[in-house]
């Protein structure tokens, strides 16, 4: 199994969620986060002055999938999140040793 951790622009979240659901990826954990990468923040005009915002709002999506579903999920996320502009996001793929469903005790390795 793999944990696919994705960080995207908030305005792309509904597109990504819909695309994932259409491909059968329904369970996910969503967290509102702040961060920066290549983008290094933005400069805004505020009350007549310039203000630098170096940590931008992002959405983090976490989903655990079978190894065989990893590439399909990555393609789905990439296609639905991409705008072609700096700050589109990042995908991390992390091995998962096992998962345990708390309600039933069912283990998946």
Q: Which residue ranges define each predicted feature?
A:
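Positively charged, small/polar-rich N-terminal and surface patches that mediate targeting and assembly
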Residues: 1-109
């Amino acid at each position: 199994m793999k944990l696919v951790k994705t960080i995207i622009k908030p305005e792309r979240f509904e597109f990504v969620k819909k695309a994932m659901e259409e491909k059968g990826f329904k369970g996910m954990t969503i967290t509102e986060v702040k961060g920066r990468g290549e983008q290094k923040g933005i400069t805004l005009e505020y009350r007549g002055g310039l203000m630098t915002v170096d940590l931008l709002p992002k959405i983090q999506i976490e989903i655990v999938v079978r190894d065989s579903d990893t590439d399909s999920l990555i393609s789905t996320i990439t296609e639905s999140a991409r705008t072609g502009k700096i700050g589109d996001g990042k995908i991390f793929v992390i091995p998962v040793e096992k998962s345990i469903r708390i309600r039933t005790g069912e283990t998946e390795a």
